[in-house]
Amino acid sequence: METVQLRNNPRRHLKKLSEESLNKQPEEVFDVLEKLGEGSYGSVYKASHKETSQIVAIKQIPVESDLQEIIKEIAIMQQCDSLHVVKYYGSYFKNTDLWIVMEFCGGGSISDIIRLRKQTLKEDETATILQSTLKGLEYLHFMRKIHRDIKAGNILLNSEGTAKLADFGVAGQLTDTMAKRNTVIGTPFWMAPEVIQEIGYNCVADIWSLGITAIEMAEGKPPYAEIHPMRAIFMIPSNPPPTFRKPELWSKDFVDFINLCLVKNPELRSSATELLQHPFIKTAKGESILRHLINEAQDAKLKRTELKQREVEPEEEENADEDEADVGTMVQAGSKDLNTMKEFSTMNEAADCTMVEKDKLNTQMGTMLINDEDEEETGTMKQCTEPVQPAKPSFLEYFEQKENQFGTPEKTTPAPSTDPSEWKIPLNGDYSFLKDWSVTELQLRLNSLDPMMEQEIEEIHHKYQAKRQPILEAIESKKRRQQNF
């Protein structure tokens, strides 16, 4: 109803907060209606602008958060005026919080829609979303801005089905004197190879991320999602470009579009303007085909809320978050027979860390910033330099107690060391000794492999940095010397 009223009376449509409104307390200007979730750096709320009744989104950020990054986000949003970029209306300081007032997108993020419907997107739906997203990227890149965190969680739909780019917490400005940036920033699984390798990158890094996002929309998760993010960071630059798990399910145009986005050499990668002319995008249907997605997601969210209110008993409340994290089975919608169930896969809700609705989920898919010389401490996802020893599962302790209680049978081979650091690769490559180990011992060793790998990766990273830093310092020293002359 509000949308119709605003359309019939365009003078009452909020474009920007007036100076008078900005000088008032935010509660005098807005009615906060409900919490929507968690965004980068703070909580996001749905609110109503009292003067126009327009619904807006308000991001509330604690002042102790990284103000430099927040100011950068505001500055980038202020400079943007595009139908396909979330609009900025103004900001307030309230007690210890900064309130950023932005355009409200009632459809939610694409990842929210996939999660709530428990179903991936069809090919024509993906094409329509990609078309709007490319228009937003074309605008940003024309303004010499890189988003640097393109993924389904950062593409929002309004109630009409228009896709808009959101969450500029890690976006960067490209200047003439800094044609390529050298900071590793973004979300690991969506990162372009040149971003990971720190060899300098420009706007087409967003195009790689868009290609990964297209796979995410079609299959429910990005490539490498099943493996540890730190391992993915090593695999993305060294492996061939990813593609669909089953390319035969998709049209040739869609597969070709993905291939053009995921070109490892950034100089050969297509731009947003070029991709808008691709047959897969040019034949995309209108935004109206996305409205049923929005309605189905909102219905699912409402049912989920009602079910939660009915079923959660007081003694179960502490386990409610764990129950919500199980989103069941997701149906993958193929392209050749849209009415046939093509494939089932389990979707992990942790894949979307941009906005977690109400329930706080632990995730390993967060936005990552590594080795930024100017913004060294600003990353959302920090690297842990100390190796974490795995907690021993309770079932292992149970079996060990039983073995101690009744005595362990004699073994033909020595008992394996419980210290992972002592586990060596056999020189002859013969692992036949493993057949004499108990299930408990094998499970313990298996559970310790990932922490061992992370520790080794961290050590390699430190060695690389130790070699790299003197070279950077020498280059900087020579530049200063040249300037003095």
Curated annotation (Swiss-Prot):
Pfam families in the cross-refs: Mst1_SARAH (PF11629), Pkinase (PF00069)
UniProt-annotated location(s): Cytoplasm; Nucleus
Sequence ranges assigned to domain Protein kinase in this UniProt record: 30-281
Record key words, sorted: ATP-binding, Coiled coil, Cytoplasm, Kinase, Nucleotide-binding, Nucleus, Phosphoprotein, Serine/threonine-protein kinase, Transferase
Signal peptide: none
Cited PROSITE patterns: PROTEIN_KINASE_ATP, PROTEIN_KINASE_DOM, SARAH
GO cellular component term of the entry, any: cytoplasm
Entry similarity comment: Belongs to the protein kinase superfamily. STE Ser/Thr protein kinase family. STE20 subfamily.
Protein name per Swiss-Prot or TrEMBL: Serine/threonine-protein kinase 4
Organism: Xenopus tropicalis (Western clawed frog)
Lineage: Eukaryota, Metazoa, Chordata, Craniata, Vertebrata
